[in-house]
Amino acid sequence: MPDRTYEFVQLDVFTQTALAGNPLAIFTDARGLNDAEMQALAREMNLSETTFILPRDPATEAREGKKVRIFTVEQELPFAGHPTLGTALHLYASDLASNSTKSDQITLDLKAGKIPVRFTANSENAGRERVDGQVFGEMRQHEPEFGTTFSREEVARVIGIAVDEISSEWPIQAV
């Protein structure tokens, strides 16, 4: 990445306290970065996730949402909740989202598909504990895909614990 500069911000998600919560790095304009460079930057950030916003023309963003890619230090993810909420909040609160000042919803266009995130202020959170100054984000995730189930014995053997340490109340299943 010779002679290129990319701005990023680091947010503390799920908290109002600095240096608490779950940290997230967000590259605010990742145009020009290839997959390997995004992966290298995520590895350099060394956080659980790093997101890369790829701005598009306003008409496409209004129709398709904000293009965002999510990386861990090891690989790209099609979806993860923490970076989706954190990136959507950053867009909601910044001038990068050209329509965010007119709408309470930001749609992210991720590898997994489009994920709408709706924001509400305290006065709109009926039935929830009010916390001054907070904004609440809700996202509609895709339906889960349920995969293979595993026996308690198999899981106990793999993780090195006794079978009776695993509850038999619920199935053990890949989701």
Describe the residue ranges of each PLM region.
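Active-site proximal loop and beta-alpha junction motif in alpha/beta enzyme cores
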Residues: 1-79, 85-175
